[in-house]
């Protein structure tokens, strides 16, 4: 390619291209620090090396590492959800299952079509697909790390015995994925929960705070879901534009290498512009995916976890009201009064316990998400400005070269 278009290291450098953990503004302390220090992809499985540093007396050592798979993360998440003691807390959303099928399929198709393209085109596309695979891999690791960090930062969940076993037990936990029967059971449980949710949602809350939160979270969840879908379309559009620039640039380069005439030199210079513009457009897509799309996806899952908390509280409120009615009937009939009183007291205690912790959880959730969105949106705006300046610089340099000024 012809030299002359200086892309400027200030705009197109490769610094900070690594995918960092999705920012959720985690408030952790030095007493328990968890991270994923390494990860290894083996066919359809990813093995995560979970590294822990702790000064808590519950652990035998101050620093240790174990190897865990995705199914073990799901087991830990499900153990929190199924524990009645945690009914009043927002359970950190489980990380999504690793999925590299699309990237592997693209690499396979590229290998099959190697004979129909030039060596330069094949090398360039192979590098891009490998970079895409690596980005997905890093994102997968980040999502699993965020889950562990959220648990480690929680004042109650961090004390859970299963969590300590997950972090410290250096053998296989013998956790398997759910079979078809268990998946079917989960499906019916979700159907029953959805139907019950409709009944529970019709109950007027006795506390204005929770009534407001329920209305807000329903609207918030739907808005985030819509924004997430639109953000994905936006990043795909930028990626498609980058792919189009690549095809146009390759075609112009092929035309430019046909001869040494002025028009061929012109094609080579414009081809170089398209190649460098493609890189910027691809980075715009990657930045939007990391800073916005991933954040929206995370808070879509966390807002669902907050809705689940409110459902559990509403379910507890309905049980408490039903227990009050049952007690009134028992007293009227003067039958099984002691049993009804005991049941009513237990329901009351459960409802009050959930309400007390749920209020603080929802306040913390608001603080966390506002800080996360503020940080990511500011960073995204700064990156968008940087890329826009990079595009402007490239166009100015290209015009200068074409006009013969340099």
UniProtKB/Swiss-Prot annotation:
The keyword Protein transport applies. Its main location: membrane. A 1,2-diacyl-sn-glycero-3-phospho-(1D-myo-inositol-4,5-bisphosphate) binds at residues 41-47, 100-106, 114-117. GO terms for cellular component: cytosol; early endosome membrane; nucleus; retromer complex; tubular endosome. CDD domains: BAR_SNX6 (cd07662), PX_SNX6 (cd07292). Residues 26-173 form the PX domain. It holds the Pfam family Vps5. The modification Phosphoserine is found at residues 116, 194. It is found in: Early endosome membrane; Cytoplasmic vesicle; Cytoplasm; Nucleus. One of its GO terms (molecular function) is phosphatidylinositol binding. Residues 2-179 are annotated as: Interaction with PIM1. Residues 203-406 form the BAR domain. PANTHER family: SORTING NEXIN FAMILY MEMBER, SORTING NEXIN-6. The PX domain mediates interaction with membranes enriched in phosphatidylinositol 3,4-bisphosphate and/or phosphatidylinositol 4,5-bisphosphate. Involved in several stages of intracellular trafficking. Interacts with membranes phosphatidylinositol 3,4-bisphosphate and/or phosphatidylinositol 4,5-bisphosphate. Acts in part as component of the retromer membrane-deforming SNX-BAR subcomplex. The SNX-BAR retromer mediates retrograde transport of cargo proteins from endosomes to the trans-Golgi network (TGN) and is involved in endosome-to-plasma membrane transport for cargo protein recycling. The SNX-BAR subcomplex functions to deform the donor membrane into a tubular profile called endosome-to-TGN transport carrier (ETC). Belongs to the sorting nexin family. This is Sorting nexin-6. It comes from Pongo abelii. The lineage of its organism: Eukaryota, Metazoa, Chordata, Craniata, Vertebrata.
């Amino acid at each position: 390619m012809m030299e002359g278009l200086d892309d400027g290291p200030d705009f197109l450098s490769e610094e900070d291209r690594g995918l960092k953990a999705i920012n959720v503004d985690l408030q952790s302390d030095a007493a328990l620090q968890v991270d994923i220090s390494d990860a290894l992809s083996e066919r359809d499985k990813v093995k995560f090396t979970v590294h822990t540093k702790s000064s808590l007396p519950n652990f035998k050592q101050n620093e240790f590492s174990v190897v865990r798979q995705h199914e073990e993360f799901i087991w830990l998440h499900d153990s929190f959800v199924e524990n009645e003691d945690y009914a009043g807390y927002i359970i950190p959303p489980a990380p999504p299952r690793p999925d590299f099928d699309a990237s592997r399929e693209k690499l396979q198709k590229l290998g099959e079509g190697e004979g129909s393209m030039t060596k330069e085109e094949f090398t360039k596309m192979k590098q891009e697909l490998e970079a895409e695979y690596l980005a997905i891999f890093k994102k997968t690791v980040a999502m699993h790390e965020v889950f562990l960090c959220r648990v480690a930062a929680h004042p109650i969940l961090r004390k859970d015995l299963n969590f300590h076993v997950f972090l410290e037990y250096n053998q296989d936990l013998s956790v398997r994925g759910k079979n078809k029967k268990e998946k079917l059971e989960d499906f019916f449980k979700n159907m029953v929960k959805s139907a019950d949710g409709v009944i529970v949602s019709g109950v007027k809350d006795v506390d204005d705070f929770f009534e407001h939160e329920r209305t807000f979270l329903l609207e918030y969840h739907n808005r985030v879901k819509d924004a997430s879908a639109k953000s994905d379309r936006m990043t795909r559009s930028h990626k498609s534009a980058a792919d189009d620039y690549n095809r146009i640039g390759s075609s112009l380069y092929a035309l430019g290498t046909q001869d040494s005439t002025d028009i061929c030199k012109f094609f080579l210079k414009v081809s170089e512009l398209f190649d460098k513009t493609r890189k910027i457009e691809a980075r715009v897509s990657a930045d939007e995916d990391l800073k916005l799309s991933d954040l929206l996806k995370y808070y879509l899952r966390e807002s669902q976890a907050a809705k689940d908390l409110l459902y559990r509280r509403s379910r507890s409120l309905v049980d408490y009201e039903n227990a009050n009615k049952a007690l009134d009937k028992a007293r009227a009939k003067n039958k099984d009064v002691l049993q009804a009183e005991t049941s009513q007291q237990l329901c009351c205690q459960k409802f009050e316990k959930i309400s007390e912790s749920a209020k603080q959880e929802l306040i913390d959730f608001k603080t966390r998400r506002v800080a996360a969105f503020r940080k990511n949106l500011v960073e995204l705006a700064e990156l968008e400005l940087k890329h826009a300046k990079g595009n402007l610089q490239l166009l100015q340099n290209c015009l200068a070269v074409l006009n013969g000024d340099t």
